[in-house]
Amino acid sequence: AINGERILKGMDYYPLLDGKAGERVLVTIKKASGLEVDEVVVPVSAGVVNSLLYKRWVRHNAAMVEKLSGGRLGYVHLEGMNDPSFRTVYSDILGRYNHCEGIVIDTRFNGGGRLHEDIEVLFSGEKYLTQEVRGKDACDMPSRRYNKASIMITGEANYSNAHGTPWVYRYKKMGLIVGKPVPGTMTSVNWETLQDPTLYFGIPVVGYRKADGTYLENDQLEPDIDVENTKELVVTGRDEQLEAAIKALLNQLNRK
Protein backbone atom coordinates (compact mmCIF):
# COMPACT_ATOMS: atom_id res chain seq x y z
CA ALA A 1 0.00 0.00 0.00
CA ILE A 2 1.06 3.60 -0.58
CA ASN A 3 -0.15 6.13 2.00
CA GLY A 4 -2.79 3.63 3.10
CA GLU A 5 -4.17 2.89 -0.38
CA ARG A 6 -3.80 -0.79 -1.20
CA ILE A 7 -2.24 -1.82 -4.48
CA LEU A 8 -4.14 -4.63 -6.15
CA LYS A 9 -2.68 -7.06 -8.67
CA GLY A 10 -2.22 -5.39 -12.07
CA MET A 11 -2.93 -1.94 -10.64
CA ASP A 12 -0.96 1.06 -11.93
CA TYR A 13 0.47 2.53 -8.73
CA TYR A 14 2.47 5.33 -10.37
CA PRO A 15 -0.35 7.91 -9.95
CA LEU A 16 -0.07 7.38 -6.18
CA LEU A 17 3.52 8.71 -6.36
CA ASP A 18 2.80 11.58 -8.75
CA GLY A 19 4.07 14.86 -7.32
CA LYS A 20 5.45 13.19 -4.21
CA ALA A 21 9.17 13.82 -4.90
CA GLY A 22 10.84 15.10 -1.74
CA GLU A 23 7.84 14.25 0.47
CA ARG A 24 7.57 11.56 3.14
CA VAL A 25 5.49 8.66 1.84
CA LEU A 26 4.24 5.69 3.88
CA VAL A 27 4.77 2.38 2.10
CA THR A 28 3.28 -0.83 3.50
CA ILE A 29 4.96 -4.06 2.42
CA LYS A 30 3.36 -7.47 2.92
CA LYS A 31 5.91 -10.24 3.37
CA ALA A 32 5.43 -13.84 2.24
CA SER A 33 4.68 -14.76 5.85
CA GLY A 34 1.73 -12.38 5.80
CA LEU A 35 3.40 -9.88 8.12
CA GLU A 36 2.89 -6.26 7.07
CA VAL A 37 5.76 -3.79 7.54
CA ASP A 38 5.50 -0.01 7.29
CA GLU A 39 8.38 2.02 5.84
CA VAL A 40 8.61 5.78 5.40
CA VAL A 41 10.40 6.68 2.16
CA VAL A 42 11.16 9.91 0.32
CA PRO A 43 10.69 9.51 -3.47
CA VAL A 44 13.06 11.35 -5.79
CA SER A 45 12.51 12.91 -9.20
CA ALA A 46 13.52 11.40 -12.53
CA GLY A 47 16.33 13.94 -12.68
CA VAL A 48 17.76 12.71 -9.38
CA VAL A 49 17.52 9.11 -10.60
CA ASN A 50 19.43 10.04 -13.75
CA SER A 51 22.10 11.75 -11.64
CA LEU A 52 22.47 8.66 -9.45
CA LEU A 53 22.72 6.43 -12.53
CA TYR A 54 25.40 8.72 -13.97
CA LYS A 55 27.46 8.61 -10.78
CA ARG A 56 27.18 4.82 -10.71
CA TRP A 57 28.38 4.67 -14.34
CA VAL A 58 31.42 6.82 -13.53
CA ARG A 59 32.27 4.71 -10.47
CA HIS A 60 31.96 1.54 -12.55
CA ASN A 61 34.26 2.93 -15.26
CA ALA A 62 36.81 4.07 -12.69
CA ALA A 63 36.79 0.63 -11.08
CA MET A 64 37.28 -1.06 -14.46
CA VAL A 65 40.24 1.18 -15.30
CA GLU A 66 41.85 0.43 -11.95
CA LYS A 67 41.25 -3.31 -12.38
CA LEU A 68 42.34 -3.67 -16.00
CA SER A 69 45.40 -1.44 -15.59
CA GLY A 70 46.49 -2.97 -12.32
CA GLY A 71 46.17 0.41 -10.63
CA ARG A 72 48.51 2.12 -13.09
CA LEU A 73 45.85 4.37 -14.64
CA GLY A 74 43.17 6.72 -13.38
CA TYR A 75 39.82 7.64 -14.94
CA VAL A 76 37.90 10.91 -15.17
CA HIS A 77 34.72 11.80 -17.06
CA LEU A 78 33.98 15.31 -18.29
CA GLU A 79 30.23 15.51 -17.71
CA GLY A 80 30.03 18.99 -19.24
CA MET A 81 32.42 21.64 -20.46
CA ASN A 82 31.83 23.76 -17.38
CA ASP A 83 33.36 24.81 -14.07
CA PRO A 84 31.92 22.03 -11.85
CA SER A 85 33.17 19.32 -14.24
CA PHE A 86 36.59 20.97 -14.49
CA ARG A 87 36.90 21.16 -10.70
CA THR A 88 36.04 17.46 -10.36
CA VAL A 89 38.60 16.46 -13.00
CA TYR A 90 41.26 18.78 -11.53
CA SER A 91 40.71 17.39 -8.04
CA ASP A 92 40.83 13.77 -9.19
CA ILE A 93 43.90 13.85 -11.44
CA LEU A 94 46.01 15.81 -8.96
CA GLY A 95 44.52 14.10 -5.91
CA ARG A 96 43.25 10.53 -5.86
CA TYR A 97 45.07 9.64 -9.12
CA ASN A 98 48.28 11.54 -8.43
CA HIS A 99 50.14 8.25 -7.95
CA CYS A 100 49.00 6.83 -11.31
CA GLU A 101 51.20 6.71 -14.40
CA GLY A 102 48.51 8.01 -16.73
CA ILE A 103 44.89 9.11 -17.00
CA VAL A 104 41.93 8.15 -19.20
CA ILE A 105 39.89 11.26 -20.09
CA ASP A 106 36.33 10.31 -21.05
CA THR A 107 34.30 12.96 -22.93
CA ARG A 108 31.44 10.76 -24.15
CA PHE A 109 27.88 12.14 -23.89
CA ASN A 110 29.23 15.62 -23.13
CA GLY A 111 26.86 18.32 -24.39
CA GLY A 112 29.43 21.10 -24.53
CA GLY A 113 30.10 24.44 -22.86
CA ARG A 114 33.50 26.13 -23.02
CA LEU A 115 36.49 24.31 -21.58
CA HIS A 116 38.88 23.57 -24.45
CA GLU A 117 41.49 26.10 -23.32
CA ASP A 118 41.37 24.93 -19.71
CA ILE A 119 41.75 21.27 -20.68
CA GLU A 120 44.63 22.16 -23.00
CA VAL A 121 46.48 23.97 -20.20
CA LEU A 122 45.70 21.33 -17.56
CA PHE A 123 46.87 18.31 -19.56
CA SER A 124 49.87 19.83 -21.35
CA GLY A 125 52.20 20.17 -18.38
CA GLU A 126 55.87 19.21 -18.86
CA LYS A 127 57.98 18.27 -15.86
CA TYR A 128 60.84 20.68 -15.17
CA LEU A 129 61.61 20.15 -11.46
CA THR A 130 61.18 17.68 -8.62
CA GLN A 131 60.47 18.93 -5.14
CA GLU A 132 62.56 17.08 -2.56
CA VAL A 133 62.09 16.99 1.21
CA ARG A 134 64.86 15.43 3.33
CA GLY A 135 66.06 13.23 0.52
CA LYS A 136 62.58 12.06 -0.51
CA ASP A 137 60.74 13.11 -3.67
CA ALA A 138 57.66 15.11 -2.68
CA CYS A 139 56.12 16.06 -6.03
CA ASP A 140 56.84 17.05 -9.60
CA MET A 141 56.75 20.57 -10.95
CA PRO A 142 54.49 21.83 -12.34
CA SER A 143 52.30 20.54 -9.52
CA ARG A 144 49.09 22.22 -10.72
CA ARG A 145 49.18 20.84 -14.27
CA TYR A 146 49.12 17.22 -15.37
CA ASN A 147 52.51 16.17 -16.74
CA LYS A 148 51.97 12.44 -17.28
CA ALA A 149 50.50 10.43 -20.16
CA SER A 150 46.82 10.67 -21.07
CA ILE A 151 44.34 9.37 -23.61
CA MET A 152 40.88 10.66 -24.58
CA ILE A 153 37.64 8.79 -25.36
CA THR A 154 35.06 10.33 -27.69
CA GLY A 155 31.66 9.29 -29.05
CA GLU A 156 28.93 10.24 -31.48
CA ALA A 157 26.95 12.01 -28.74
CA ASN A 158 29.71 14.58 -28.13
CA TYR A 159 28.42 18.03 -29.03
CA SER A 160 29.71 21.58 -29.48
CA ASN A 161 32.71 22.13 -27.18
CA ALA A 162 32.88 18.37 -26.71
CA HIS A 163 33.94 18.43 -30.38
CA GLY A 164 36.28 21.39 -29.97
CA THR A 165 38.06 20.03 -26.89
CA PRO A 166 39.09 16.72 -28.53
CA TRP A 167 40.12 18.71 -31.62
CA VAL A 168 42.48 20.84 -29.51
CA TYR A 169 43.73 17.69 -27.76
CA ARG A 170 44.57 16.23 -31.18
CA TYR A 171 45.99 19.47 -32.62
CA LYS A 172 48.35 19.95 -29.66
CA LYS A 173 49.46 16.29 -29.91
CA MET A 174 48.56 15.69 -26.28
CA GLY A 175 47.59 12.04 -26.75
CA LEU A 176 45.60 9.50 -28.74
CA ILE A 177 41.83 9.66 -29.21
CA VAL A 178 39.80 6.43 -28.92
CA GLY A 179 36.14 5.75 -29.64
CA LYS A 180 33.86 6.95 -32.44
CA PRO A 181 33.91 10.05 -34.67
CA VAL A 182 32.59 13.32 -33.25
CA PRO A 183 30.23 15.38 -35.46
CA GLY A 184 31.61 18.80 -36.41
CA THR A 185 29.52 20.90 -34.05
CA MET A 186 32.08 23.31 -32.57
CA THR A 187 30.39 26.74 -32.53
CA SER A 188 29.44 29.28 -29.87
CA VAL A 189 25.84 30.39 -29.48
CA ASN A 190 23.68 33.14 -28.03
CA TRP A 191 20.92 31.69 -25.88
CA GLU A 192 17.43 33.07 -26.47
CA THR A 193 14.40 32.48 -24.23
CA LEU A 194 10.86 32.84 -25.58
CA GLN A 195 7.81 34.23 -23.79
CA ASP A 196 7.32 30.73 -22.43
CA PRO A 197 10.53 30.39 -20.37
CA THR A 198 10.53 26.62 -20.85
CA LEU A 199 11.32 27.24 -24.53
CA TYR A 200 14.88 28.38 -25.20
CA PHE A 201 17.47 27.69 -27.85
CA GLY A 202 20.97 28.64 -28.92
CA ILE A 203 21.69 30.61 -32.09
CA PRO A 204 25.21 29.92 -33.48
CA VAL A 205 27.04 33.23 -33.86
CA VAL A 206 30.73 32.29 -33.50
CA GLY A 207 32.68 30.05 -35.85
CA TYR A 208 36.12 28.60 -35.14
CA ARG A 209 38.39 29.02 -38.18
CA LYS A 210 41.54 26.99 -38.63
CA ALA A 211 44.79 28.20 -40.18
CA ASP A 212 43.81 26.75 -43.56
CA GLY A 213 40.64 28.87 -43.63
CA THR A 214 38.20 26.03 -42.93
CA TYR A 215 35.92 25.89 -39.91
CA LEU A 216 35.51 23.28 -37.20
CA GLU A 217 31.77 23.29 -37.85
CA ASN A 218 30.88 20.35 -40.11
CA ASP A 219 34.47 19.06 -39.81
CA GLN A 220 34.01 15.62 -38.28
CA LEU A 221 36.75 14.53 -35.88
CA GLU A 222 38.01 11.00 -36.52
CA PRO A 223 39.53 9.04 -33.62
CA ASP A 224 43.01 7.55 -33.84
CA ILE A 225 41.57 4.21 -32.75
CA ASP A 226 38.01 3.63 -33.98
CA VAL A 227 36.11 1.37 -31.58
CA GLU A 228 32.37 0.75 -31.40
CA ASN A 229 30.57 -0.40 -28.29
CA THR A 230 28.52 -3.32 -29.59
CA LYS A 231 25.10 -3.74 -28.02
CA GLU A 232 25.73 -7.43 -27.37
CA LEU A 233 28.56 -6.56 -24.96
CA VAL A 234 27.11 -3.31 -23.59
CA VAL A 235 24.23 -5.23 -22.00
CA THR A 236 26.77 -7.45 -20.21
CA GLY A 237 28.51 -4.44 -18.68
CA ARG A 238 31.45 -4.39 -21.09
CA ASP A 239 32.79 -1.10 -22.49
CA GLU A 240 34.98 -1.87 -25.50
CA GLN A 241 35.96 1.76 -26.01
CA LEU A 242 37.16 2.04 -22.42
CA GLU A 243 39.02 -1.25 -22.71
CA ALA A 244 40.71 -0.10 -25.93
CA ALA A 245 41.77 3.17 -24.31
CA ILE A 246 43.29 1.33 -21.35
CA LYS A 247 45.18 -1.04 -23.64
CA ALA A 248 46.50 1.76 -25.87
CA LEU A 249 47.69 3.91 -22.96
CA LEU A 250 49.38 0.97 -21.23
CA ASN A 251 51.14 0.08 -24.49
CA GLN A 252 52.35 3.68 -24.73
CA LEU A 253 53.68 3.59 -21.18
CA ASN A 254 55.35 0.22 -21.68
CA ARG A 255 57.27 1.53 -24.68
CA LYS A 256 58.93 4.26 -22.62
Task: Map each language-model feature to its residues.
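Metal-dependent DNA phosphodiester-chemistry modules and their immediately adjacent helices/loops
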Residues: A63, N158-S160, Q195-D226
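Extracellular low-complexity, Gly/Ser/Thr-rich intrinsically disordered linkers
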Residues: E228, I246-K247
